[in-house]
Design a protein with these regions (language model features):
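Structural detector for internal amphipathic alpha-helices that build alpha-solenoid repeat scaffolds
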Residues: 1-14, 24, 33-47, 66-80, ...
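Short, charged low-complexity linker/loop segments at the C-terminal edge of domains
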Residues: 151-152, 175-185
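Terminal, low-structured helical/coil segments at or just beyond the last alpha-helical repeat
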Residues: 180-204
């Protein structure tokens, strides 16, 4: 219930009282997921306040690294060259924890349209030692890649057949970009609908 409330608070952008409230949750709440959701909302409500907390959260351990992943999302929401470089460092081998690195790959994807060199990073990540990193790189190539990247996906399929489903979906998305856009939009609408339903339940 509280997590749905924290999510709803992101609608109060630039509200000082909401910002202060969310900061207190981040500082005092003992529940990892509560802190994670509060920070994600703070990034929307008050990105300046979120910036002051992001470094400490990057060093805060939690179950499945949910807090560190939330901190990494800041660099994909507040988009600038400095944050892009930060994501490149976090996504590199040893840049952050094993569980959190894949999130850095996801956030890098938000820069792919404006920074075309990002797709080259995803191609490099196909050779990473961590399967979750390779999987997320495949997904980003499916979203932003071109036909010339299909060979790299085929090579990975031969080396890591466990990722077959992800690779085939990525290749299909590249070959049929109109369907890719439609599927991404449908998924986003479904997620927003679910979150709105949760908020309505709280209100009622």
């Amino acid at each position: 219930v509280r997590r749905a409330i924290w999510y709803a608070l992101r609608n109060y952008k630039e509200d000082e009282q909401v910002s202060i409230f969310l900061q207190r949750i981040i500082e005092n709440d003992k529940k990892y997921y509560s802190v994670s959701d509060a920070f994600r909302s703070l990034v929307i409500v008050d990105s300046s306040a979120a910036k002051k907390k992001v470094d400490s959260l990057l060093n805060r351990d939690s179950h499945t690294d949910v807090i560190r992943k939330a901190a990494i999302s800041y660099f994909g929401i507040v988009m600038n060259d400095e944050n892009y470089n930060k994501l490149k460092n976090l996504s590199a081998y040893g840049g952050t924890t094993w569980d959190a690195r894949p999130e850095a790959i996801n956030q890098l994807g938000k820069y792919a349209n404006n920074k075309t060199e990002t797709i080259d990073l995803f191609i490099e990540f196909l050779s990473d030692n961590t399967r979750s990193v390779r999987r997320n790189a495949v997904r980003q190539i499916g979203r932003y890649g071109e036909k010339k990247h299909l060979d790299a996906l085929d090579e990975l399929l031969a080396e890591d057949p466990i990722l077959e489903r992800n690779i085939r979906y990525a290749k299909k998305s590249i070959l049929k970009p109109s369907n890719k856009m439609k599927n991404d939009q449908e998924k986003e609408i479904e997620e927003l609908t679910k979150k709105l339903d949760n908020i309505r339940k709280l209100v009622n």
